[in-house]
Amino acid sequence: MSELAQRQLTELAEISDGAIQLLGTVTESGLTTLTVSLDTSGIETANGGIRLRARERFEIIVGPSFPDLHPDVNVAHRRWAGTPHVQWGRHLCLYAAPSVEWNPADGMRGLIARLNLWLQRAAAGELDPAGRPLHPPVAYHSYKHGWVVVRPDLGDLVPWTNAGPERVKLLYAWCAKRGKRIDVLEWLTRQQIIDRLVADDLRAQGENGVAYFAAPLVLISDTLEMEYPTTAALLAGALDTYGLNRDELLRVLVNARIINKAIGVTLEGDDAVPAMMLLGTPARRLEPGVLLAHITAWHLDDLGADITDLLQEVSPEHVELAARVRKLAHDWLGFARLQWMVIHEARPEVTRRRDAGSPLQWLAGKRVLVLGCGALGAPIAEQCIRAGVAQLHVIDKGAVTPGILLRQPYEDADIGYNKAERLATRLSRIRHDLTVTSSSANIVTGTLTDPADLLQYDLIVDATADIGVRVGIERARGAIRAEWPATISALFGHTAQRGVATISLPGATGSGHDILRRLSIDTAITAPAGWKDLADDLFPNPPRTERFFPEPGCSAPTFTGSAAETAALASALLVSAVSVLASTDAEPMTAIGCDLSPEVRGPRPVRLGWRNDVILPDKTGNYEVRINARALAELRTETRRGRRVRGGRIETGGMLL
């Protein structure tokens, strides 16, 4: 579609009064290059931005997929090399997110407008404003060389946080290798490495074939160009200007090999750890005045690894041989191309959680117990993991059966195995820092018989939809309700389109069983707004006689609903319930109703709350009498009125409690 692009650009030039000039067109290898000249005389430079001449020339490269894909824009000079969003010194990065920012309907008019906006911002030095996600210096990497997940913050370890003379600093990344993937687990100084070696505290192998090794991290206090060097010679030259000469660079690589050899890491063969180095430079933001480290990594080619091994093994006593090996190493730096590795940032200091502002952030750092690992409990447990809980324990005595696979997150290989065990195994793979624990105990006769053991949790989620479990929780928490964790009990309606979650805070009079009783009473005659359909589904009157039995024999009746419906409803109930926990004005007892049916009208979710009751202990200790505070006040008022009107000897009908 280069003809379309050329025609649009020609029409723009004709009506631009000379501001846009089409100078030439060249088509080669399926790409059309349109050379244009733009009037940029009105764009002023400020804040160290790029300098523009009265007119600037650009090469617009149009592919066969135009206008579905945006054209690329290059310049013929390198005057703007080193500027943010200028790659390879000539390529202008106009779109941070083309799928959002490029509109095919705008065509060349939209491209020229975007280019003009880019030039204005580049001249004003505003291409990387504070608070925007970082566009780092560009290192052209490939997954074939491996990828690195960086997890620990560097914080004050960087040399540019103090006013001292130190411009270069060497640290070591303690890494775990799984295939081509490398995880940086922590940063260590050289002395810490030595101390751990002496203490035999550095292991070379872990579980499931994980290999551990050390890789050097060189931190320099000045930013490199926006494109990182493509050859070892250019990188070595850049590092030399910042205080790390070629001999020191080679020494860094050699020392890393010596350390890994001492640890016992495999350095040769298919299972060898990579000879690699990480480079850290100051990023240009995140907040004003704060310079965080931007990290890249490069992998030595096989010859480079062999040379560093030679440098390690040659004896200083063999002066001539050592000099020849050193010359060989310098020669290698001169011709070796850098193999940049892909970096995946997971450092909290430079990344932002994608769930920022979500109610589920309340779960971060919490210890959570999930009872039941079915269509309700399994999705909730997974949401807890992704929300950042510090501990998760799941309990279910049931086994995975073929019929549940259509709506519960298990697979064919899980059939016959315990649900909780299989769920915990899968969820433990989501995060590197958390192992989910499980139990197949009977919740009523096992878990709830030791209530004190449950006080370690911040939240208990009852996803069993089992009345026996709900009653068991009421009894277990009765004597220690002030210390009992916040508890969510949830259940689905008969078609998994409606559901209710109850929330009881620490110290609440009742939990799920009691709150559902209150809810059924309060919605029985005149249901509050939004509750009628929910009440008819969950508390049918008369009770529903037709039940769904999925398997022959004595299988338990259940609801109907697909995986999409159960996952959506479970997530909606969890978000709504946690919103109550995160609020500051929640009643001690709350019920949340979620109606996801297509025909629903009115507010959703809907919410009812109750204050604590007055609790009167039974003399036998077997019962607990709970009286609504308002009802108790009315009873007292009536008994006092009766005494006053009828006298103290009149039978009150049991109202004098």
Where are these regions (language model features)?
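N-terminal beta-strand/alpha-helix entry module and adjacent surface
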Residues: 599-657
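Glycine-rich phosphate-binding loop and adjoining beta1-alpha1-beta2 segment
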Residues: 397-433
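Glycine-rich adenosine-cofactor-binding loop
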Residues: 356-401
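Compact alpha/beta protein-protein interaction domains typified by the UBC
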Residues: 24-109, 113, 158-159
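A structured beta-alpha segment of the ubiquitous adenosine-cofactor-binding alpha/beta core
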Residues: 424-458, 464-466
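Glycine/serine-rich phosphate-binding loop and adjoining beta1-alpha1 elements at the start
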Residues: 149-366
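Adenosine-phosphate binding glycine-rich loop
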Residues: 486-599
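ADP-ribose/adenylate-binding Rossmann-like module
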Residues: 459-503
